[in-house]
């Protein structure tokens, strides 16, 4: 009698965040089905969990139009090759992890061949280019969404979607230890502390750093002992920030950190940050915040017309109201930013209420996402 084939899951991750998700999913699946086989495009973490890498994840990790165009031929070749090889392999389920421009077309190709497909991490279709939802619906059997309002959006279009909670909410404690974070960063327990996070991209750091520094200078007038910490994602961004600081506030003492953004948020009484995942992480760190963001005028004009949501930051989208002050474009200037941060640093009613709401929102999206994703994969495999 022929030996029964083990459960076979094909996966494609296109960047580091996807590698983390893929590794967590593989771990949860292996705990239930130890002999399951995992193949596809994987980073080092997925490979460490036993995923066979037909291609290295770095092959897909290209950003920006110029880089994508330069690699387009190679990317199209990889996608065509994966379509063929997965078609021959006939995995029980294909899971495309994020990387929507690459994965959603691949999912569609495989679904046409009768292979069950999951897209893990919803693109921001609820915010802009909403018509993409129809292609996603045609290409996938199920979307796994991190956030409850994403599921509500897909439900409107009858696209199968499962809210699984957010892996970051699982990884972070409900009540972070502020004192321990300060000890790790060498910040005295008795002083007020402000974290500045001017973004992870070069363009953001260029646009925001000077105004963020001027804001901290204004706040120092009220709080002379204010400590300012600035976590920077890499050496390039640190160099860039140091140059801007030398031009803007050469005498101001700030503590620059290499990474350590999470510790900086937990240790701080308030944070000023660019929007993006940092705002969600800051919420989970229970650090009251103000979001400041600016882009080139034409980009902002275009975004205003394309973006369909009332807010840009995830805490506000989760709360369904302006929980966190958002100061965008012309409003993103030192006087306004300082005025918004002032009540948060005062450590009174405003920051306490924000802290409590952050905790409630954290509980709402803390659902053991790796396990839920594994449940979804196995349920689809059985159908």
From Swiss-Prot:
Keyword Nuclease: no
Cellular component, GO, one term: membrane
Catalysis: reaction(s): 2-N,3-O-bis[(3R)-3-hydroxytetradecanoyl]-alpha-D-glucosaminyl 1-phosphate + UDP-2-N,3-O-bis[(3R)-3-hydroxytetradecanoyl]-alpha-D-glucosamine = lipid A disaccharide (E. coli) + UDP + H(+); a lipid X + a UDP-2-N,3-O-bis[(3R)-3-hydroxyacyl]-alpha-D-glucosamine = a lipid A disaccharide + UDP + H(+)
Cell inner membrane as UniProt keyword: no
BP GO annotations: lipid A biosynthetic process
SUPFAM superfamilies xref list: UDP-Glycosyltransferase/glycogen phosphorylase
CDD domains in alphabetical order: Glycosyltransferase_GTB-type (cd01635)
Family: Belongs to the LpxB family.
Protein name: Lipid-A-disaccharide synthase
Source organism (scientific name): Klebsiella pneumoniae subsp. pneumoniae (strain ATCC 700721 / MGH 78578)
């Amino acid at each position: 009698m022929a030996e029964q084939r083990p459960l076979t899951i094909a996966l494609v991750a296109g960047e580091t965040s996807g590698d983390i998700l893929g590794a967590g999913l593989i771990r949860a699946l292996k705990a239930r089905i130890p002999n399951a086989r995992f193949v596809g495009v994987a980073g080092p973490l997925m490979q460490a969990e036993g995923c066979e890498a037909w291609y290295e994840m770095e092959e897909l990790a290209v950003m920006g139009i110029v880089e994508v165009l330069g690699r387009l031929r190679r990317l199209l070749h990889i996608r065509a090759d994966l379509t063929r090889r997965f078609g021959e392999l006939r995995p029980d389920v294909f899971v495309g992890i994020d990387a929507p421009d690459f994965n959603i077309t691949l999912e569609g190709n495989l679904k046409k061949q009768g292979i069950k497909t999951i897209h893990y991490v919803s693109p921001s279709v609820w915010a802009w280019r909403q018509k993409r939802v129809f292609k996603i619906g045609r290409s996938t059997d199920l979307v796994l969404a991190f956030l409850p309002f994403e599921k509500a959006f897909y439900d409107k279009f009858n696209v199968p979607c499962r809210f699984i909670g957010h892996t970051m909410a699982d990884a972070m404690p409900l009540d972070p230890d502020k004192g321990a974070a300060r000890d790790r960063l060498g910040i005295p327990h008795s002083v007020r502390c402000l974290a500045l996070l001017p973004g992870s991209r070069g363009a953001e750091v260029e646009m925001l750093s000077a105004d963020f520094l001027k804001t901290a200078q204004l706040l120092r007038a009220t709080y002379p002992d204010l400590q300012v910490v600035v976590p920077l994602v890499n050496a390039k961004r640190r160099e860039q920030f140091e140059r801007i600081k030398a031009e803007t506030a050469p005498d101001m003492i700030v503590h620059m950190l290499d990474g350590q953004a999470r510790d900086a948020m937990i240790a701080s009484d308030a944070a000023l940050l660019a929007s993006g995942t940092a705002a969600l992480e800051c919420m989970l760190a229970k650090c009251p915040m103000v979001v400041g963001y600016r882009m080139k005028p034409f980009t902002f004009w275009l975004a205003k017309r394309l973006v369909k949501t009332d807010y840009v930051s995830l805490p506000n989208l989760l709360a369904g109201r302006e929980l966190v002050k958002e100061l965008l474009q012309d409003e993103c200037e030192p006087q306004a930013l300082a005025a918004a941060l002032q009540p948060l640093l005062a450590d009174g009613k405003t920051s306490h209420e924000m802290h409590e709401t952050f905790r409630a929102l954290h509980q709402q999206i803390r659902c053991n996402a790796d396990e839920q994703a594994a449940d979804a994969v196995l349920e689809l495999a059985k159908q």
